[in-house]
Amino acid sequence: MTTEPGDRAWVLHHYPYGDTSLIVELFTRTQGRLGVLAKGARRARSALARIEAGRPLWVRWLGRGELPVLAQAEELGPFLPLNPLQNLSLFYVNELLLRLTQRRDPFPDLFQVYEETIDALCSEPGEGWYLRRFERRLLENLGWAPDLAHCAECGRSPDAASSEHWLYQAAHGVFCRAHAPDAAVAIEAAALVWLRGAMQTRSMPVWNSSLRRCLEQELLVHLGGRPLESRRLLTAYLRRTQPAMTIQKREEHSE
């Protein structure tokens, strides 16, 4: 059985296999999403026992089939304890990768954005701009991101200095007011310019709602209309812990 070269990776999800093992879904730098069999990982003294989401790992595996065997998993940094909202945000980005990417389809640029998202999630809890950036970069890497630079009907471009609102329609792109389609989401021109750019700085808080709605609708098209479990859990958590009037606001920041 061939041992593959090592790779940097993050755990997206794992579930039991047999009495002592785990099936682990990894997001790796060179292979993209990779499923591996972690033999004996459920034993308390196993070297693989600390595998969990949110930990950067250096991994090696044996074999090239659909489910190679995990041979080594070394921690590359400390695991930072996350609060419930941070955990739900981590679950959210991991669920997007699990639902929308295929195994062994590498996305090195997206891997870097994923790591930047985890860093921001730990250092800026409660802010949602890095999730919007991840969503947009995911769509771009998968070839699904619509053109945000021009009106899909007339070709006019949004002006960041303008207070004008544009219209966003999932799977079709953006439209100026003169060509507004039905069932579209209003979004600030400056927010569109930010969304199609590098997105290295925070978005304006006033954009949170429109950015979230636009990207949520776009993602739902590719999720086959089947909602994400992480969104359901976020709403349930906020209903238990926050007054009803703050739920929408916290959703806009956290997802």
UniProtKB/Swiss-Prot annotation:
Short name of one Pfam family: RecO_N
Keyword hit for DNA damage: yes
UniProt keyword annotations, A-Z:
DNA damage, DNA recombination, DNA repair
The signal peptide annotation in the UniProt record is: none
Give the CC-aspect GO terms: bacterial nucleoid
Q: Which domain of life is it from?
A: Bacteria
Any coiled-coil regions, as ranges: none
The UniProt entry's GO biological process terms, in alphabetical order, are: DNA recombination; double-strand break repair
Q: Say which family it is in.
A: Belongs to the RecO family.
Give the matching NCBIfam families: reco
Role of this protein = Involved in DNA repair and RecF pathway recombination.
Protein name from the UniProt record: DNA repair protein RecO
Organism in which the protein naturally occurs: Acidithiobacillus ferrooxidans (strain ATCC 23270 / DSM 14882 / CIP 104768 / NCIMB 8455)
Report the gene name.
recO
